[in-house]
Amino acid sequence: MANIKSAIKRAKLSEERRSHNASIKSDMRTAVKTVETLVTNNDLENAKEAFKTASKKLDKAARKGLIHQNAAARQKSRLAKQVNA
């Protein structure tokens, strides 16, 4: 554990950011899984709506630096291919 005051503050801030980033990534993964389950159940109307939400969450995560922009684009492309099939 850190002994210096500034190091203690940095450790606390780092933990807060880690938990915040983890929640955003979790929401993103949940949105992607929702689209995939709706597609497998042939519920294409709801899948298209869920795809819009998932796309927004992927873009936001990429913008925040939680995932790479190309990774977000790749996931969106694969989801779009499933929804439009």
From Swiss-Prot:
Q: Hey, which family's this protein in?
A: Belongs to the bacterial ribosomal protein bS20 family.
Output the Pfam families linked to this UniProt entry.
Ribosomal_S20p (PF01649)
- Function of the molecule: Binds directly to 16S ribosomal RNA.
Q: Name one GO biological process term.
A: translation
Signal peptide (from-to):
none
Instruction: Please give the Gene3D superfamilies that the UniProt record associates with this protein.
Output: Ribosomal protein S20
List every stretch annotated Disordered. 1-24
NCBIfam families from the entry? Answer: S20 (TIGR00029)
Q: Which gene encodes it?
A: rpsT
Whether Ribosomal protein counts among this entry's keywords is yes
| Molecular-function annotations in GO | small ribosomal subunit rRNA binding; structural constituent of ribosome
**Protein name as catalogued:** Small ribosomal subunit protein bS20
Report keywords, A-Z.
Answer: Ribonucleoprotein, Ribosomal protein, RNA-binding, rRNA-binding
GO cellular component annotations, sorted alphabetically? cytosol; small ribosomal subunit
